[in-house]
Every structure is written in structure tokens, then in C-alpha cells.
């Protein structure tokens, strides 16, 4: 159990300090979900991690078209805090973010 907790803590520290990981919003049906943009793939696709509240390091990896992902101008610490606090405080952190849905979303 100690190794598992230690490994999760080390992973969290790596993600918080990783310059290549970008907080983002992912278009899901009629709304947005906070995500971590991990890397570009071929043909306009990207790899994202969708964290599950309230644990910022638990969730799912998804491969999506890049036009469904909107990078955010916030830090990883801020993005992880949104997840940890189950969205409370999002209004301040996401102030000024473009929340218009992509064309065809939710259709």
C-alpha cells in the first residue's frame, strides 16, 4: 500500500510540474469537461486525460480530434484544484475562458 501511495504522489508531482501537460477543456455533448492535454497525435488528434473529481490523478485517457479540445491559460495546480474541489471555485479560475461550444456540438 505504501508503494501505491508513494507512486501516486510522485505521479502527481510530475504532472503538476510538467511543462508539456496543458490544462484544457474538452467538448463533451452539450458542455465542457476539465482535462489535461498530454500530446498531439497524427492527423489532427490529441491525447487527453480526463480527471474524475475529487481525485485529480484518477480518470481516463481519451484520444480526440484537436478541435474538441480548448487549451486553458491556467496552471496545472489550478486545474487540479478545480477537480479536487468538485468544481467549486471554477468561476474565478475560468473567468475569461471561451466557453462557446464548437460548431455541431451537442447535435
Task: Report the location of each language-model feature.
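Membrane-targeting alpha-helical segments
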Residues: 1-4
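Glycine/threonine-rich ATP-lid/beta-loop region of ATP-binding domains
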Residues: 9-12
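Terminal membrane-proximal soluble interaction domains of membrane-associated proteins
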Residues: 16-107
Amino acid at each position: 500500500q505504501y508503494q501505491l501511495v508513494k507512486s501516486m504522489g510522485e505521479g502527481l508531482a510530475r504532472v503538476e510540474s510538467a511543462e508539456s501537460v496543458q490544462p484544457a477543456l474538452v467538448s463533451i455533448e452539450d458542455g465542457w469537461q476539465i482535462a489535461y492535454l498530454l500530446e498531439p497525435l497524427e492527423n489532427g488528434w490529441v491525447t487527453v486525460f480526463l480527471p474524475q473529481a475529487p481525485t485529480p490523478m484518477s480518470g481516463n485517457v481519451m484520444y480526440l480530434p484537436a478541435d474538441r479540445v480548448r487549451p486553458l491559460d491556467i496552471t496545472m495546480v489550478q486545474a487540479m484544484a478545480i477537480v479536487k474541489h468538485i468544481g467549486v471555485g471554477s468561476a474565478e479560475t475560468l473567468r475569461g475562458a471561451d466557453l462557446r461550444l464548437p460548431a455541431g456540438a451537442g447535435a
